[in-house]
Regions:
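Hydrophobic alpha-helical membrane-insertion signals
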Residues: 1-9
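Conserved, well-structured interaction surfaces
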Residues: 14-89, 105-120, 124-146
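A structural signal for well-ordered alpha-helical segments within the folded catalytic domains
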Residues: 44, 48, 120, 152-157, ...
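Short coil/turn linking the two alpha-helices of tandem helical-hairpin repeats
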Residues: 86-87, 91-93, 164-173
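Aromatic-lined, polymer-binding surfaces characteristic
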Residues: 91, 144-156
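Short, conserved phosphate-binding/catalytic loop or strand-edge motifs used
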Residues: 95-103
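Acidic, serine/threonine/proline-rich low-complexity intrinsically disordered regions
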Residues: 98, 112, 169-176
Length: 176
């Protein structure tokens, strides 16, 4: 065995757990893989929380500039969560608005959006966030700016999304 064996189909997981058998037999799928489900659920939860935050932030006692900044950050986070989903799973359903809790289940069974739709949505949301109140340089404020999304971070995600869009993984309109 060479140093690259772990990255090939010659890998054998020697754990005694159930996942080892599934991996060794090439039969693992999303229903048995908690990591796959965790990412899907947590990123869509982030999208939902961003939408709910944006919907209700106007009721909070904030200044106009704080409100604009926080809405822009929520919009950028939503786009980033979509980018993570698309990068991991390929095209996903793009939800522009949050669904009400009493929405009939047949209306919630959405098909994947196209590759173009996903990336267009991600890039447009990030550009809107840049123009809607993101800070120029959040890291310059060492007390409240650390960890906040600013224009440079949004631009970095735009560049990364467009790079993925142009790559062989997503270049061409296919629905997988």
């Amino acid at each position: 065995p060479g140093p690259w064996t772990g990255a090939s189909d010659e890998t054998e997981w020697t754990s005694s757990g159930n996942k080892a058998k599934l991996i060794n037999n090439n039969s693992i799928d999303a229903t048995e893989n908690t990591m796959v489900l965790y990412r899907w659920k947590s990123w869509y939860s982030g999208i939902h929380e961003s939408a709910v935050f944006t919907k209700y932030v106007d009721q909070a006692p904030l200044t106009a500039s704080e409100r604009a900044q926080w809405k822009a950050e929520a919009k950028a986070l939503r786009a980033i969560y979509y980018f993570y989903l698309v990068r991991t799973y390929g095209p996903v359903p793009v939800l522009e608005d949050d669904y009400a809790l009493d929405t009939p289940s047949n209306e919630l069974q959405l098909s994947r959006s196209t590759v173009d739709r996903c990336f267009d949505f991600i890039v447009s949301e990030l550009k809107e966030a840049q123009n809607a109140g993101l800070l120029e340089d959040a890291s310059s404020d060492k007390t409240t700016g650390v960890g906040r999304i600013d224009k440079a971070i949004a631009q970095a995600f735009i560049i990364e999304a467009l790079t993925y869009r142009a790559s062989w993984l997503f270049n061409g309109e296919c629905n997988y």
